[in-house]
Design a protein with these regions (language model features):
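Terminal-appendage/accessory-domain detector
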Residues: 1-171
């Protein structure tokens, strides 16, 4: 093309590597679910609870996230396919509580699992001011759990896999 500026295309070549600014998805689900998954993993490690110990789970999300992975809640609590599961905060949270994370095989193992689907019904989603303030730069979440009558909360501003919170080699 005429009028192009080759200097714009080569500025920083060999010095600036834009791939270092890309995020990597550690879980096979909608990126909006990842901060909540991270928060649940952290709470499980800290509190050592099982699904039987849970009285309540509420995932606080931005409005954008709620519209993608939270609403309509009844549909999100009853995913019928892998894609439904990928875009269901209740399902992703239930699997994380049951298995300690979320991997591809979890869809096969949990989509028709009565215990997992029953746990989905305990999981609520709600608007969260802190998550909203971080959106759209970060896909944040606040996880609130009630374990054996005690309330706990974890806010994850930057989910794993973002350049500012990149995964460790073992992850």
């Amino acid at each position: 093309a005429s009028g192009g500026d080759v200097n714009k295309a080569t500025t920083g070549l060999g010095e600036e590597f834009e791939t270092l600014n890309l995020g990597v998805k550690p879980y096979p689900s909608c990126r909006y679910s990842h901060a909540a998954i991270d928060g649940l993993i952290e709470l499980k490690k800290e509190l050592k609870f099982s699904s039987d110990d849970l009285d309540d789970i509420d995932i606080g999300l931005s409005e954008t996230a709620l519209n993608i992975i939270g609403y309509p809640l009844t549909d999100k609590q009853h995913p019928k396919s892998v894609v439904d599961g990928q875009f269901s905060m209740p399902f992703c949270a239930a699997v994380t509580v049951k298995s300690g994370g979320l991997q591809w095989d979890d869809y096969k193992n949990h989509l028709n699992n009565k215990d997992t689907l029953s746990l989905c019904n305990k999981i609520k989603v709600s608007p969260d001011e802190d998550a909203e303030k971080c959106c759209p730069e970060y896909m944040s979440a606040k996880v609130k759990v009630v374990v054996k009558g005690e309330k706990y909360e974890k806010f994850v501003k930057i989910p794993k896999g973002e350049p500012e919170n990149f995964m460790e080699d073992v992850e």
